[in-house]
Design a protein with these regions (language model features):
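Intracellular alpha-helical coupling/juxtamembrane segments of multi-pass membrane proteins
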Residues: 250-300, 305
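ABC ATP-binding cassette signature C-motif
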Residues: 1-260, 309, 318-517
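Post-kinase regulatory C-tail/linker adjacent to protein kinase catalytic domains
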Residues: 313-315
Length: 517
C-alpha cells in the first residue's frame, strides 16, 4: 500500500536547483535511509514532503488518515512544560477519546432506551480503541522511553527550559517515538545520542512496524536499521534495495559501467568526427561522411555528472607548547548548580583525548571552562605555556547574516579574495555555497565553513565539540585523517566510536565525575 506519492517534484533556491523532476512512491513499512553529500537537499526534501516548504513544481499526495511524525529540533518547548508532560502529550488524542467517552456516560441518565443503546455502542467502540492503543499503560510506556533515552535520570518533573539542546532533542524524539506515527521522519537523530541510547534506538527502529525515512551520516547505524536507500545526487533521487554497504557496492558498479560506456562512446564520437572531417569534401566519400554525420546527430550522448568537490583538511601546527596543556585543581564546573565533582585533571602535550558520556553531563561546559568562557563554580584551570588554541563549537549562531566569504575574510583580513575562495573550496564548498549566507547552508556546509577557519590558523591544541555532527561520509573520513596527522594536541567531545577509534590516545568517560547521573 502506498502511503506517499510524489510526482515530478522540482525545487530550488534562487538559481540553485535542488531537485529536478523527482518522482517516487513510499510503501507501508519501508525503512528508508536518505543519503547524499552535504548540501544535496535532504532536509529540504523532508520540509517539502511535510508541507513546511512549498515546492516550485510537482505533486505530493499522502494517503488518507496517515499520521506523519517529524523530528524537528526547532519545535518550541515553553517554560512550565516538564519532560513528563511533553512525553505524555504524545497520547493527547487518546485523552480526548477518554473525555468523549466520559461525556457519553454522563449523558446516559437523560436519554431514552434507544438512544442509550446507541450511546453505549459508541462508548464501547471508544473503549476498544483505548484498549487497542494501550491507553491504560501510558505511564509505563512513558517510563520505558524516558529510561531508554536517559531522561528518567533527569526527572520527569524537570522543566524543559532547563535542559541542554541535546536533552531537548531527546525529549522531542521520545514524544515522537511514543506517538508511533504511520511514517516517521528522522533528521540525523544520533547527533545528540551517546552509544547506549543509539543502541536502544537501533533496536526500536528494527522493531518498528510502520515506515520511516532516516537521514544519517552514521554508516554503522544506517546499516543496522534500513532496508532501502534513497540516494540524492545531482538533483535526482535514486532507489536502491538493501543497506548502505549494498547501495555503495551497486552505486560504484553503476558508476564504473557508466564511465566505461562514456569513454567508449567518446572514442566512437572522435572517430566519426574525424571521418566526417576527412571525407565530407570528397565526392567519392561524401555519402559515407553524411551517413556518419547522421549517426552523430542521432546519438544519445552520455553525460557524466560533475565530480563533487571533496574536502581537504590539513591543520597548520604552531610552535611546540610546554609539557602541560592544562591542569585543573579542584575544578567544579556548572552554571547555577554544579555539573561535576571536584576535578583534578591534566593534559600533556601530544595527547588526543576524547570526552564521552550522555548529553547534559557537562562535556561542553568543561571545554568552555578550560577556555575561560565560563567561570568555574570553584577550583581553577591552569593553562600551559605557548598555547595556540583552536576551538570548534557544536553549533553556530543562526542570527549571523554574513556570507561564507565574509566569514573567512573577517577571520583573516590579510587574505586576498583568491585566497579566501581557495580556502573555502578546499573544504569542499562550491562557488554557489561560497557566495551564500552561512545561515542558509545545510548543517554540514556550515560545519565546513567553521573548519575552514580552524585549518587556516596555526594551532597546537584543538578543542572540538562534536565536530562530526552533520558532516557527510567523505568529509568525516577526511577530518579523521587530518586529525590523525595533526602534530598538536586534541581535546574532543564525540559520540562516534568509529570516528575516534585509532585517533584518540585517551578516552575520558565524563559520567564518572558528573553529578547529573
Amino acid at each position: 500500500m502506498s502511503i506517499l506519492n510524489v510526482e515530478h517534484l522540482s525545487h530550488g533556491f534562487g538559481d540553485r536547483a535542488i531537485f529536478e523532476d523527482v518522482s517516487f512512491r513510499l510503501l507501508k513499512g519501508e525503512h528508508i535511509g536518505l543519503v547524499g553529500a552535504n548540501g544535496e537537499g535532504k532536509s529540504t526534501f523532508m520540509n517539502i514532503i511535510t508541507g513546511r516548504l512549498m515546492p516550485d513544481e510537482g505533486k505530493i499526495e499522502w494517503a488518507k488518515k496517515v499520521r506523519v511524525g517529524y523530528l524537528d529540533q526547532h519545535t518550541a518547548l515553553e517554560k512550565g512544560m516538564t519532560i513528563g508532560s511533553v512525553l505524555s502529550s504524545a497520547f493527547d488524542f487518546l485523552y480526548d477519546m477518554e473525555n468523549e467517552m466520559n461525556d457519553i456516560y454522563a449523558r446516559l441518565g437523560d436519554v431514552d432506551e434507544d438512544e442509550m443503546n446507541k450511546l453505549m455502542d459508541e462508548a464501547g467502540t471508544i473503549q476498544d480503541m483505548l484498549t487497542m492503543h494501550d491507553f491504560y499503560m501510558i505511564d509505563a510506556k512513558v517510563d520505558e522511553v524516558a529510561r531508554a533515552l536517559g531522561l528518567l535520570d533527569l526527572g520527569l518533573d524537570k522543566d524543559v527550559t532547563d535542559l541542554s539542546g541535546g536533552q531537548r532533542t531527546k525529549v522531542l524524539m521520545g514524544k515522537l517515538l511514543l506517538e508511533k506515527p504511520d511514517i516517521l521522519l528522522l533528521d540525523e537523530p544520533t547527533n545528540y545520542l551517546d552509544v547506549e541510547h543509539i543502541e536502544w534506538l537501533k533496536r526500536y527502529l528494527n522493531d518498528y512496524e510502520n515506515a520511516f525515512i532516516l537521514i544519517s551520516h552514521d554508516i554503522p547505524f544506517l546499516n543496522s536499521v534500513v532496508n532501502l536507500i534513497y540516494h540524492m545526487d545531482n538533483k535526482k533521487l535514486d532507489r536502491y534495495v538493501g543497506d548502505y554497504d549494498k547501495f555503495m557496492e551497486v552505486y560504484e558498479m553503476k558508476k564504473a559501467q557508466l564511465e566505461a560506456a562514456y569513454n567508449k562512446q567518446q572514442q566512437e564520437i572522435k572517430e566519426l568526427k574525424d571521418f566526417v572531417a576527412r571525407n565530407k569534401a570528397r565526392v567519392a566519400t561524401r555519402n559515407m561522411a553524411m551517413s556518419r554525420q547522421k549517426k552523430l546527430d542521432k546519438m544519445d550522448v552520455i553525460e557524466l555528472a560533475a565530480e563533487k568537490p571533496k574536502p581537504e583538511f590539513n591543520f597548520k601546527t604552531a610552535r611546540t607548547p610546554g609539557r602541560y596543556i592544562f591542569q585543573t585543581n579542584g575544578l567544579v564546573i556548572g552554571y547555577d548548580d554544579p555539573l561535576s565533582s571536584a576535578l583534578d585533571l591534566e593534559m600533556e602535550r601530544g595527547q588526543k583525548i576524547v570526552l564521552t558520556g550522555a548529553n547534559g553531563i557537562g562535556k561542553t561546559t568543561l571545554l568552555k571552562s578550560i577556555l575561560g568562557l565560563i567561570k568555574p563554580l570553584s577550583g581553577s584551570v591552569i593553562l600551559g605555556d605557548y598555547l595556540e588554541i583552536g576551538y570548534f563549537e557544536q553549533e553556530m549562531d543562526q542570527s549571523v547574516t554574513t556570507t561564507c566569504i565574509e566569514e573567512i575574510w573577517n577571520e583573516f583580513p590579510a587574505f586576498s579574495q583568491y585566497e579566501v575562495r581557495s580556502a573555502l573550496a578546499k573544504c569542499g564548498l562550491t562557488t554557489k555555497h561560497i557566495e551564500s549566507q552561512v545561515r542558509v547552508l545545510s548543517g554540514g556546509e556550515q560545519a565546513k565553513v567553521r573548519l575552514c577557519k580552524l585549518i587556516n590558523r596555526e594551532t597546537n591544541i584543538l578543542l572540538l565539540d562534536e565536530p562530526t555532527n552533520h558532516l557527510d561520509v567523505d568529509a568525516k573520513d577526511e577530518l579523521k585523517r587530518a586529525l590523525k596527522e595533526y602534530k598538536g594536541s586534541i581535546l574532543m567531545v564525540c559520540h562516534e566510536p568509529d570516528f575516534y577509534d585509532g585517533l584518540a590516545t585517551d578516552v575520558w568517560d565524563c559520567s564518572k565525575w558528573t553529578t547529573r547521573l
